[in-house]
Amino acid sequence: MNRIYSLKYCHLTQGLIAVSELASRVSSKTGRKLLAIFIVSALSYGAAEYACAAQMDTRNFWIRDYLDLAQNKGAFQPGAYGVKTPLKNGGEFSFPEVTIPDFSPVSAKGATTAIGNAYSVTASHNGTIHHAIKTQTWGQSDYHYVDRVTKGDFAVQRLDKFVVETAGATEHADFNLSAAEALERYGIEFNGKKQIIGFRVGAGATGVTSYGVGQTYNPLLRSASMFQLNWNNMYASNNTGGFYNEVTGGDSGSGFYLYDNQKKKWVILGTLTGKVFSSKDTWAFFARYDQNTVDILKNTFTQEVNLNGQKMTVNNKNIAINDKITAIELTKSNKNKDLKFHGGGSIELTDNLNSGTGGLIFDEGQHYSVIGKDKAYKGAGVEIGKDTVVDWSVKGEANDNLHKTGAGTLNVNVAQGNNLKTGDGTVFLNAEKAFNAIYVASGRGTVKLGQADALDKNSDYRGIYFTSRGGTLDLNGFSQSFKKIAATDVGTIITNTSDKTATLSLQNPSRYVYHGSITGNTNIEHTGTQKSADSSLIIDGNINTRNDITVRNSQLRLQGHATSHAIFREGPRHCYVPGVLCDKDYVTDFARLESEANKKNNSAYKTNNQVASFDQPDWETRHFRFKTLNLENSEFTTARNSVVEGDIVASNSTLKLGGDVPVFIDMYDGINITGNGFGFRQDVREGRSADDGSSSYTGKITLQKGSTLDINNRFIGGIEAHDSKVNVTSPDALLQNSGVFVNSTLSVRDGGHLTAQKGSTVTAGFRLERKVRFPLSGTPENGADNTWMPVLTYMTEGYDLTGDTLR
């Protein structure tokens, strides 16, 4: 390997890069081409028009494909298997036969990887003063560098708070394996053979074929690489099967992932150091993950406390157990350590406890009580082990966030006066307004109410915000009213596990999309004092409750979800001097570069810089199950990709099941939570999708007082109408139960096909228009083949038949 290179300063990123002085020379002595080394530092970007211009190969892939994979968007949800993506040439690319990794451990700027608790890993040559290292971000939380330990180019870092947005990459590859053993352990099927294939995500200098963007460390432009690993020399080739995204300036420190066939999970291999290249080939090389280095730093920041069921007192200097006093330790760099408790017991604060960058860690399967009259705690957070309960009876410090991790339970018994950020386990709110605001992340955490006013009743969102993958709010028998639920995706779940029924009331005064789900013993209400066209409640998550939904003087719209995708930029390009000195308008350039492929494939949505589009083909089906939907002076629609099961009772209302009904998208879908996690935004758009998609309804509908029902998609069930109208255009409508139409009309038209299996009674009017079918059949008898029970269809006003193709 050529090790002759010069270090050059890059003013763009304030750092040094390694540039080979022999990159194009050939050794006459050996006849072998020498390899050049390029260190893609978190401090480097420039040397390298070569590095950025040849980054993402977009000749046959869309730019968005690389971003979607990195950010687990589109088809690339964590755990998705058998993923295929369309190509610009009209073909299809099949990803390896393995689940898609969860890339949540990757920080927003891509240079670091969370490994659990308050730790992350990167490359040693990434300077600690660089913004991507000094401040590391997951979700809407900033974590600050405290200390680190290195081995070679591998570095493990201590942060100032426990990371709540991800469990982290907690397992690593075994480097003691032979090449054959490694192939068996980490090999996956791809292109007909078993290979060691993995993935990496970074936010280095973004570029596409023949075009450099000029952006580094942009969270929106995090992109993924797929590599093939040579176990013998530990080089990784990124040119794998056509999905080619080369490493570039700013990618250093990003993590490499392999699938462990033994553990059935993705593990971290190491962190990117740089790349080597000859005139023909390029390989990435990395620093191996080193558990010993990780353990050294963790031990440095841990003070063991064996409580073993006893009572302990603590202040900012000492711990006392049975009159034995132990000093609270600091690291050599004068930083606070985590206090790690074992054996359960009681902990009393005799003074306000400020642990600084240290936290409190509680072991598994124990019970602890933390007390201290009018005393407060501040620190890196609390981590509670599985099956452990911590009774928390001390306050928090104002203007601080309490970070809670671990699978155990935190019982909050006094109002904290600060904010909570939680990502795992359960937080039980037993105090009135237990926290000023609550941020729920990762999908692994539950916030459970212990009283009706545990949340902030003066906040439109009740002071609780669900970021990416959300989490669960358990009403626990306490009814709650929201103007809007601050949820960004379907990972948010509002449930009620109590035997006591709770009502979830949504009183949004303006059009609003709830992206999450509602489950459990929960009634749902959306009502107003007078009818308003503005208070439309749109749900594109799921409902699964055995209870009722009540809608009064409003609109309820149930629909599937337009799959959310990565975007390139939020808002207009940044201008230092408006109209004179501006960043490159790469969003417009991306659209230009892919315009020909988009015209050919009718795929403008691929490059329109929107999280979702009406004309995109990928919509996720949502399921809505309930006991009875009660509609009064309201409008109800089901749109594409919705499956609805439950009875409906409608009074003076309009119901449209499928067909040409509006659908809604949220231009901030997936990125609704703002600021430091305690803000919410939406931009709801109404339109028509390119395809109506499929929707279905199963249940009995009762219409009263001038209601109208339009059946435009699959329908199975019964109808009872009083002084109302029913129109059928669906080609697949089955009256499985008796149809009763009292002083009501039934019209089948526009290609409709209605089968009445148990007979019908119509006492107003029955109209069949051209190209429709209205079979009158008996009812199949259970347990008897080809046996049908006779039924009676009775129409007092006769038939109105129009057209010559009626059947």
Regions found by a protein language model. Name each.
Residues 4-31, 41-48, 53, 247, ...:
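Solvent-exposed adhesion/ligand-recognition segments of exported proteins
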Residues 23-24, 125-128, 160-165, 203-207, ...:
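Acidic glycine-/aspartate-rich tracts in secreted/extracellular proteins
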Residues 54-86, 108-126, 218-241, 245-318:
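C-terminal subregion of chymotrypsin/trypsin-like serine protease catalytic domains
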Residues 116-117, 121-152, 162-166:
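Catalytic-histidine neighborhood of serine endopeptidases
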Residues 128-140, 195-203, 258:
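Short conserved beta-strand and strand-loop elements enriched in small hydrophobics
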Residues 154-246, 250:
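Chymotrypsin/trypsin-fold serine protease catalytic domain
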Residues 310, 408, 422-430, 441-445, ...:
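Glycine- and acidic-residue-biased ligand/ion/polar-headgroup-sensing regions
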